[in-house]
Amino acid sequence: KYYFPTGGLPSQRDIMTQRAVFTEAYAVIPKGSMRDIVTSFLPNWDNTRAWVLARPLSGFAETFSQYIMEVSAGGGSTKPDTDPNAQSVLFITDGQGNLKINGVKHPLCAGSYVYIPVGAHWEIKTDATTLRFHWLRKTYVSVDGIETPDAFVTHEDKNAIDLMPDTNGAWGTTRFVDPDDIRHDMHVNIVTFQPGGVIPFEETHVMEHGLYVLQGKAVYKLNQDWVEVEAGDFIWLRAFCPQACYAGGSEPFRYLLYKDVNRHMPLKL
């Protein structure tokens, strides 16, 4: 249901050519590129490694970072983030763990979704199992008169899919934040296409995207290119990169999607 990198190292007999590409408008990091030797360790984390999928890059996607975290038994952190201006979303893909936000305990399992606002103190630990999750971070853009969002923990199964109109159920989005809640300046959703479902136009918009394929496969139109993607692949899109897709195969095509929302455009570079 939720694909996660397996690491390892390909055989010396395998060919090196895969589907990895970095362009002026988008990047694709296929699952075969997420090996042991490209992981990083992070300050104040024990028994943990991370695949860094995205970070702010000038002239590309500039608003967020995205990690895939693997916390081995007994690992975790009591000081997970070194940036006091960061807000976070965690999406658990495998294992079990324990989370504290401002002293309140929350059990975690596959499908758990966590929003951690700027200024919150949080800790995360795992005991006997390996905990795997996505960690998305963004500097919170505060606005006078608008309160900071509250922390919350939920689960995918507790949130209904909002189906797009006139798609006969082929395209829907699981939203964990009310789209009308202007306090939030980022959304992290799960988008689901049934086989044969499509984005029937080239989306071309200001929102940046981090798109991690959780399940299934599709053919994506990215800028001027058609790219085939499958579970475990990551697509990274800068603002205004045209995008559309056809979902294929025999199972739903599902991905975790980041986008920046609900704020004026900065007028200074």
Model-predicted regions and their roles:
Residues 1-63, 137-186, 268-269:
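A short, N-terminal "cap"/entry segment at the start of jelly-roll beta-barrel domains
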Residues 105, 118-144, 239-265:
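Ligand-binding loop in jelly-roll beta-barrel domains
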Residues 154-210, 214-220, 227:
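Surface-exposed interaction/gating patches
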Residues 48-55, 65-84, 174-177, 189-205, ...:
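Conserved short histidine dyad/triad with adjacent acidic residue
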Residues 85-98, 102, 206-223:
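Glycine- and acidic-residue-biased ligand/ion/polar-headgroup-sensing regions
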Residues 96-98, 121, 130, 210, ...:
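Structural motif
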Residues 103-118, 223-239:
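Short acidic-glycine-tyrosine-enriched beta hairpin
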